Amino acid sequence: WKGDDPALIMNDTSWLLEDYQRGGSVKTFVKHIEEGLKIAVEDKSSLLVFSGGQTRRQSWKTEAESYYHLALTMSKGLPFFSDSQEDPSQSRLPFEPLDKSETARASRYMSTNEHFDLGRLRMTTEDYALDSFQNFLFSIARFYEFTGTYPQKITVVSYEFKKRRFVDLHAHALRWPSNKLIPGGTQRLNYVGIDDEPNSPSIPKLHDSAYDLFEVDMYGCYGRLLEKRRKRNSGRRVPPYSSTAPELAGLVDWCPAINSRLRGLYPGWLPWDPRASTGLGRGAQVILEQNGGKFVKAEYLPDGKRIV
């Protein structure tokens, strides 16, 4: 979104669009934002992350910043921290707030309510992702930057036609435990898919052309996927997450051999592995499963020799 008059949000001319997105995609983008806001407002423990880098040469803003800005201009409810919740921004302010006059002037310019306390919002931006895999991975890293912990569950709001790509490929590449449940019975990965309306001119062109590419190149390291990232990174931004989310450094930089498919799955430890919650590694988990959930007890003589 260009950030023009909020009254013209639904006009294609207010957006930087690809040709195939004209005539219907704008309404879908707005629905995605509305759905994200709705989920975040209902789940008081959630953080809404708008993800997307500076992919357009005609704009100085990132995709995520434009969505965040648009969310502020909408009349929908916004996800605020409750009074009983700690606001992370209060403990690590990077700079002093602007004085009142500057804040008011900036607020009017941005078409937002000058009384908003943005530091109390449970939503943020992830400004480096250049494709859907990075949307997934970098949003987790940004969640850690903002909260100091990793998410227990993730809800992705995107196009329905991209669902298989996220659920079958990206989650697998991240080894995210999609089918596991958190206390309360909620799955750790949920997907809300919203496509353009059936009569939209863009519908015939909405198909997942990237699925086959990610199926072969799960981390987007080669060929057309790498070329697309380079083309989209006109701002020449470098994501900081190897430093700011250090447990993910290996995964962020991981590139297996070309055409390795599943054989190239990232082998290192990840914060959502069983070890993180149980204290047990994969080998110990296997032993437990083989022995009915119990470790075999070895018996020792007084001199320390084991009875075999």
Identify the meaning behind each predicted range.
Residues 194, 198-308:
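C-terminal accessory extensions appended to soluble enzyme cores
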